[in-house]
């Protein structure tokens, strides 16, 4: 039976079947059937509460897994690595990325709660575990009241209004961080590692609070702090023939000129005029270009090896638009002019007036350092002011990071923390700790600090009763009460990981009217946490409140879930095995005997007649 085009198009896509006509070469073979199925979805309604239970199971799994890492006595999590050794981490954000459940509904619950930790980590750089625990508390307490018949929309509005009020209360509790407290913030975030805390504190004292502090893989077994003066970027020499010190494998020049070209150099004759001036006046030249072809680079290397020319060449830092910005910054820093076709400047006609000046240039295999004597300081200050205005008007965190790095390079202050370890597994764990500590310190500089150890959230819980009086109805007040209970979840879990009863800890902390008084889980004692250095960045706590609240509202007001149906891959049809036959019979004609051919023997000397 043949289908017409109209009849075929009327069929649903998931039911269409196409039958391939037999070809002349395969007339005896059966018809090949091709079934085309659309990607179907499965809809789950929460009529009996089963959907909510599945979603909550996913949220419980995330909170339970990340909860073991919370606090100074939190445990590690071992993550399987498909292509290498397992990773041992104590970082909530890293663990969060690895969670993927088989059940589609539970996995939706995982992904919903994951947003709280991921967003907090993106904005504040730390606090992902606390966000997850707080969101889990809101969801757990919220499901209890909604199951009893409370309107989830009004409960969500109560949570939202309470969040805004608590953020205002948090800001009133916050204060600006002092220089000696930077080490405490970093150490607490790194799991009470004061070696890391002191190193980060020293880094910010060296380059200033607005300076750039970066993390790199170290060459030694211990951590090391390196302060770079001048402008440095990750671009090394284009050829090892440019080195001036063979033992150190680096090229170093003093009173050096810089040629900046925002394009690819393909013809060596284009550089003749400038390089001829360098030979006659005997000054070294650093060529910074988008790229240099080998044909153009070869004559430069030959003249360098003959001793006629002191020169080195590197690629311009970054790519695309960022490359152009970096070249402009370098031009202002050294007093050079960038050669661009759009500006009407030709490399072939350019003279030494376009060259910049550096007091010292150091080029290694992977990096370049440029130091000036400060003769362009006024132009540099104006450029820094322009970039800072861009930072204020930029909302994207990645762009802010790039702009801050440009400010630091122009200001001449970069601190590099080199992380060392015995093994690769230990190195990755230490890098994550240092990164969390650095991000927490930056957040503390930005918005101030509050008392740590989960006590700031617990103190906020005492403000909820006053906030409830401003809410519209009883159901919104229930939402505020849910928040009040959830605010005790983090400190309860910190105490549990320290083998202490959380209820007793909460009772003792709240019995003291001093807002700085709290539980120090590292020492298992109660004291003034601010004096003890147990402090949290205000920005981290604020992001935890806002993002946990947002996820909980979405979770509690969801009543239907749409998931993809897991496609079952069909097994390939295997032809039935042919009947076994003896070597002397044919598989197609088992009764017919095949002729036996004489065995061909290898030819030896005995087969040849003697002469």
Swiss-Prot record:
TM region positions: none
Subcellular location: Plastid, Chloroplast stroma
One term under GO cellular component: chloroplast stroma
GO molecular function: ATP binding; ATP-dependent protein folding chaperone
UniProt keyword list: ATP-binding, Chaperone, Chloroplast, Coiled coil, Nucleotide-binding, Plastid, Transit peptide
Pfam families hit by this protein: Cpn60_TCP1 (PF00118)
Region described as Disordered: spans on this chain: 574-595
Matching InterPro entries: Cpn60/GroEL (IPR001844), Cpn60/GroEL/TCP-1 (IPR002423), GroEL-like_apical_dom_sf (IPR027409), GROEL-like_equatorial_sf (IPR027413), TCP-1-like_intermed_sf (IPR027410)
Database matches in SUPFAM superfamilies: GroEL apical domain-like (SSF52029), GroEL equatorial domain-like (SSF48592), GroEL-intermediate domain like (SSF54849)
Domain of life: Eukaryota
Major subcellular site: plastid
Keyword Chaperone: yes
Gene Ontology annotations of biological process type: protein folding; protein refolding
Ranges in a coiled coil: 377-480
Transit peptide: 1-37
Disruption phenotype: No visible phenotype besides impaired NDH activity.
Up-regulation conditions: Up-regulated by light.
Function per UniProt: Involved specifically in the folding of NDHH, a subunit of the chloroplast NADH dehydrogenase-like complex (NDH).
Note from the entry: CPN60B1, CPN60B2 or CPN60B3 cannot complement the function of CPN60B4.
Domain comment quoted from the record: The C-terminus (568-611) is required for efficient NDHH folding, but not for the formation of the chaperonin complex.
Record-linked NCBIfam families: GroEL, PRK00013.1, PRK12849.1, PRK12850.1, PRK12851.1
Family: Belongs to the chaperonin (HSP60) family.
Assembly and oligomerization: Part of the Cpn60 complex composed of 7 alpha and 7 beta subunits. Can also form a complex composed of 14 beta subunits only. Both complexes show ATPase activity. The Cpn60 complex interacts with the Cpn10 complex. Interacts with NDHH.
Protein name per UniProt: Chaperonin 60 subunit beta 4, chloroplastic
Organism: Arabidopsis thaliana (Mouse-ear cress)
């Amino acid at each position: 039976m043949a289908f017409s085009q109209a009849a075929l198009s009327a069929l649903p896509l998931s039911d269409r079947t196409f039958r391939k006509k037999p070809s002349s070469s395969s007339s005896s073979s059966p018809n090949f059937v091709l079934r085309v199925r659309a990607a179907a979805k499965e809809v789950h309604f929460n009529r009996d509460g089963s959907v909510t239970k599945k979603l909550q199971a996913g949220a419980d799994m995330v909170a339970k897994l990340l909860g073991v890492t919370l606090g100074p006595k939190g445990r590690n999590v071992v993550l399987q690595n498909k292509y290498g050794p397992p990773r041992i981490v104590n970082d909530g954000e890293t663990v969060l990325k690895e969670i993927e459940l088989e059940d589609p509904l539970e996995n939706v619950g995982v992904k919903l709660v994951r947003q709280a930790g991921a967003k907090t980590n993106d904005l504040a750089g730390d606090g992902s575990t606390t966000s997850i625990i707080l969101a889990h508390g809101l969801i757990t307490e919220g499901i209890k009241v909604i199951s009893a018949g409370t309107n989830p929309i009004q409960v969500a509005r109560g949570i939202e209004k309470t969040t805004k009020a608590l953020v205002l209360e948090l800001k009133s509790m916050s204060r600006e961080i002092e220089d000696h407290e930077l080490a405490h913030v970093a150490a607490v975030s790194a799991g009470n590692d004061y070696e890391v805390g002191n190193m980060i504190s020293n880094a910010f004292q060296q380059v200033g609070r607005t300076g750039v502090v970066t993390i790199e893989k170290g060459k030694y077994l211990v951590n090391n702090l390196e302060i770079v003066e001048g402008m440095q970027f990750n671009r090394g020499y284009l050829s090892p023939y440019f080195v001036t010190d063979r033992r150190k494998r680096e090229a170093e020049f003093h009173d050096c000129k810089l040629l900046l070209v925002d394009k690819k150099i393909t013809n060596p004759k284009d550089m003749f005029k400038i390089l001829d001036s360098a030979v006659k006046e005997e000054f070294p030249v650093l060529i910074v270009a988008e790229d240099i072809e080998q044909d153009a680079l070869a004559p430069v290397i030959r003249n360098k090896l003959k001793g006629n020319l002191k020169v080195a060449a590197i690629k311009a830092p970054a790519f695309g638009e960022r490359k152009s910005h970096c070249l402009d910054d370098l031009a202002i820093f050294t007093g050079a002019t960038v050669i661009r076709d759009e500006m009407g400047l030709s490399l072939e006609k350019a003279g030494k007036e376009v060259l910049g000046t550096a007091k010292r240039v150091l080029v290694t295999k992977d990096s370049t350092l440029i130091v000036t004597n400060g003769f362009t300081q006024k132009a540099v200050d104006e450029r820094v002011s322009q970039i800072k205005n861009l930072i204020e008007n930029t909302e994207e965190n990645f762009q802010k990071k790039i702009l801050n790095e440009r400010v630091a390079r122009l200001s001449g202050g970069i601190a590099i923390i080199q992380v060392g370890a015995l093994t690769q597994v230990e190195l990755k764990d230490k890098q994550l700790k240092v990164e969390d500590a650095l991000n927490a310190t930056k957040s503390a500089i930005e918005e101030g600090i509050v008392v740590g150890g989960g006590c700031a959230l617990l103190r906020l819980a005492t403000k909820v009763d006053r906030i409830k009086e401003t809410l519209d109805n009883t159901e919104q007040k229930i939402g505020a009460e849910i928040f009040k209970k959830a605010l005790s979840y983090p400190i309860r879990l910190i105490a549990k990981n320290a083998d202490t009863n959380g209820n007793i800890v909460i009772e003792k902390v709240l019995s003291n009217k001093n807002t700085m008084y709290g539980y120090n889980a590292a020492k298992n004692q109660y004291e003034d946490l601010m004096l003890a250095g147990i402090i949290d960045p205000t920005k981290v706590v604020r992001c935890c409140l806002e993002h946990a609240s947002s996820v909980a509202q979405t979770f509690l007001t969801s009543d239907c879930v749409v998931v993809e149906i897991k496609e079952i891959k069909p097994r390939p049809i295997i032809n039935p095995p042919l009947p076994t036959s003896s070597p002397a019979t044919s598989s197609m004609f088992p009764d017919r005997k095949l002729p036996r051919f004489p065995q061909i023997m290898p030819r030896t000397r005995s087969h040849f007649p003697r002469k």
